[in-house]
């Protein structure tokens, strides 16, 4: 996976990296965003479902563990939208804003639930 190098070096995915190693310009360049992690969960489980290659299941499990530990708020529910490089929520913490609505997390969880059902039914 293209995410393999970045995930292992940075403990979670970063949204912006410059391929020429120049300074990024976007405000959120050093943040970890919720939706790329949702997409990794979906795509890795989909790849596992379709290929049965264990490396994709490992990616799925690694991403789920990271998201549960860092994005999910066990006390008040929902996921934080933005984490700092160290995996802690940005301050002030954001669970909903103009860019983070009720789409990616529910979609991810519904798709994952459906695919797990398909995998277990085989």
Regions found by a protein language model. Give the residues of each.
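Glycan-recognition and catalytic cores of secretory/periplasmic carbohydrate-active enzymes
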Residues: 1-122
């Amino acid at each position: 996976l293209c995410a393999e190098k970045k995930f292992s070096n940075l403990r979670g995915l970063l949204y912006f990296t410059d391929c020429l190693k120049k300074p990024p310009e976007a405000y959120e360049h050093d943040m970890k965003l919720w939706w790329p992690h949702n997409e990794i969960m979906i795509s890795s489980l989909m790849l596992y479902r379709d290929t049965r290659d264990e490396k994709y299941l490992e990616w799925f499990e690694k991403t789920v563990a990271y998201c549960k530990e860092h994005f999910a708020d066990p006390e008040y529910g929902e996921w934080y939208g933005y984490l700092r490089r160290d995996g802690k929520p940005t301050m002030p913490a954001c669970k909903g804003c103009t860019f983070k609505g009720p789409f990616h997390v529910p979609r991810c969880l519904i798709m994952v639930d459906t695919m797990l059902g398909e995998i277990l039914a085989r």
